[in-house]
C-alpha cells in the first residue's frame, strides 16, 4: 500500500483480490495514505458464483443475470442479494419465490463455494478469481453508464462500504 501511495498515480484504481480481501484492502489503503486513489476489494468472484447457481435454477444464460450484489466479506456470512437481480425486465423477487430453495440451497451453496472448491481441489480456483478480477476491471471501465451496476467493496474513510457500484462512480472526472 505504501509503495502504491507513494508511486502510483493519484487517480489509480486498486483492486485487492487476495483474501481476506476487505481487510487487505483496508490495510493497503491506510498504508497508501493517498485519499485520491480508489481502493476496492473484489466481491465479483462470489457474484459470479451466485449468478452461476441462479442461472441453473432459472434456466437462464448467466450473461442475462444482472445486478448481482454481494454484501459482506468472502466468507460464510456474506449475503448474495438475489432479490435485486434483474433478468430481462423481471426482478429476483418476481422470479424466485421458493424460500426453502433460497435458504436451504442457494445461500449455503454460494456462501460455502470457496471452501467446497478448496476441499475438492486442494486449492482455490485461480482461473475463477482471475476471471472475476477481469470482470471487475471491465465493469469499472464500462461505458454503459448508470445501468452498469456491479458488486465491489469500496474503501471509504478508512472503512469498507459494501455497495453496488456504478461504473461512472469509479471514474475521476
PLM ranges: what are they?
Residues 1-51:
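Rossmann-like NAD(P)(H) cofactor-binding subdomain of soluble oxidoreductases
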Residues 26, 172-173:
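A generic signature of intrinsically disordered, low-complexity regions enriched in glycine/proline
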Residues 163-172:
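Conserved small/polar residues in nucleotide/adenosyl-binding loops
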Residues 20-21, 74, 171:
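Short, flexible active-site-adjacent loop segments at beta-strand->alpha-helix junctions, enriched
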Residues 52-162:
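Mobile gating loops/cap/lid regions near enzyme active sites that modulate substrate access
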Amino acid at each position: 500500500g505504501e509503495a502504491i501511495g507513494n508511486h502510483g498515480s493519484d487517480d489509480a484504481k486498486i483492486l485487492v483480490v487476495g483474501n481476506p480481501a476487505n481487510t487487505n484492502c483496508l490495510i493497503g489503503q491506510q498504508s497508501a495514505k493517498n485519499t485520491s486513489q480508489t481502493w476496492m476489494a473484489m466481491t465479483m468472484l462470489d457474484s459470479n458464483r451466485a449468478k452461476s447457481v441462479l442461472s441453473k435454477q432459472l434456466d437462464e444464460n448467466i450473461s442475462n443475470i444482472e445486478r448481482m450484489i454481494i454484501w459482506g466479506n468472502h466468507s460464510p456470512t456474506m449475503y448474495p442479494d438475489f432479490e435485486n437481480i434483474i433478468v430481462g425486465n423481471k426482478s429476483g423477487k418476481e422470479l424466485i419465490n421458493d424460500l426453502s430453495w433460497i435458504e436451504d440451497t442457494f445461500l449455503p451453496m454460494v456462501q460455502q463455494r470457496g471452501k467446497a472448491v478448496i476441499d475438492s481441489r486442494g486449492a482455490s480456483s485461480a482461473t475463477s478469481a482471475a476471471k472475476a478480477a477481469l470482470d471487475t476491471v471491465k465493469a469499472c471501465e464500462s461505458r454503459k453508464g448508470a445501468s452498469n451496476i456491479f458488486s465491489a467493496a469500496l474503501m471509504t474513510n478508512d472503512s469498507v462500504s459494501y455497495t453496488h457500484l456504478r461504473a461512472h462512480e469509479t471514474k475521476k472526472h
